[in-house]
Amino acid sequence: MAGGKIRKEKPKASNRAPSNHYQGGISFHKSKGQHILKNPLLVDSIVQKAGIKSTDVILEIGPGTGNLTKKLLEAGKEVIAVELDSRMVLELQRRFQGTPFSNRLKVIQGDVLKTELPRFDICVANIPYQISSPLTFKLLFHPTSFRCAVIMYQREFAMRLVAQPGDNLYCRLSVNTQLYARVSHLLKVGKNNFRPPPKVDSSVVRIEPRRPGPQVNKKEWDGFLRVCFIRKNKTLGSIFKQKSVLSMLEKNFKTLQAVLASLQNNGEPALNTTSMDLGDQSMGMEDDDNEMDDDDMEMDEGEGDGGETSEFKEKVMNVLKEGGFEEKRSSKLSQQEFLYLLSLFNKSGIHFT
């Protein structure tokens, strides 16, 4: 109108959600570790690096609203998606209902750590980072073999998985994981690739279980590594002089000797002591980040009131000297060196569970 103000109209916002990111009006909870992949190029890269075959059954853990699920369905034969959040389950079902993918998608609602997993060829997972360790070992100990797992982890956890002897992040988790699998770092993922963005960067790691698996008693191996990594930068000689360590080992030693003596008196055949389980003193294979730095605790070297004897202490030290391990540090030892040292202890009747 003449003499009046011209009002500029604001462009109308589109009601259509971006085609690359399926939102569905769901709010995501950071407290539950819900961070949905929103970068389609990253989704494509993960699928490509997984090496999926058209005949593969794919286990997807934490599918969210299905951005990655769609690409997995396009690449493989079937997707079995395990999702805890009932809202996400409904969103997945709604998204693929009436599409060519609907009969190739099976959704299981539940906690993946408590769910009996079916047979699968490949696992692809974008998980809450708080379940990283227990989920990793659940997969590694899965009763049926699978080709690989491609998993999104918090970056520091991922770098601990792939760390090598001498690396700052080399730890019990590194040795444990690499005993059971070949592990490789695939991608570094910035926090802005997620909705909502997490506080830390992430990494995608490929895990390929070793077949056949290692011939080692899991509890014995884990108990042994827990001792070795009490303080990974101290010498093994210092670690194995600790009263608490000597007391535990001597208790196991005496228990084993009593069992063997009882069997001998009853005329029963000798046991394979390298595979014996003398009681569950370990806490499982999960990484609990209990390794200590040099200033975290004082050493409790020498004899104490725990029942350990100077003779047994000498026996333990002789094992370390025999293998040339007394002055070595866990932070520098390879997997094969750990296996060799454990075999020397077992050969001397010394056990860690």
UniProtKB/Swiss-Prot annotation:
The protein's enzyme class: transferase
GO BP: cell division; cell fate specification
Binding-site list for S-adenosyl-L-methionine: H35, L37, G62, E83, D111, N126
Tissue specificity as recorded in UniProt: Expressed in rapidly dividing tissues, including root meristems and lateral root primordia, developing cotyledons and leaves, petals, anther, pollen grains and silique abscission zone.
Keywords: Methyltransferase, Nucleus, RNA-binding, rRNA processing, S-adenosyl-L-methionine, Transferase
One Pfam family it belongs to: RrnaAD
NCBIfam families to which the protein is assigned, alphabetical: ksgA (TIGR00755)
Function: N6-adenine methyltransferase which modifies the AA dinucleotide at the plant nuclear 18S rRNA nucleotides A1785 and A1786. Required for generating appropriate patterns of gene expression during root development, including the cell-specific expression of transcriptional regulators involved in root hair and non-hair cells patterning.
Protein name (record): Ribosomal RNA small subunit methyltransferase
Record organism: Arabidopsis thaliana
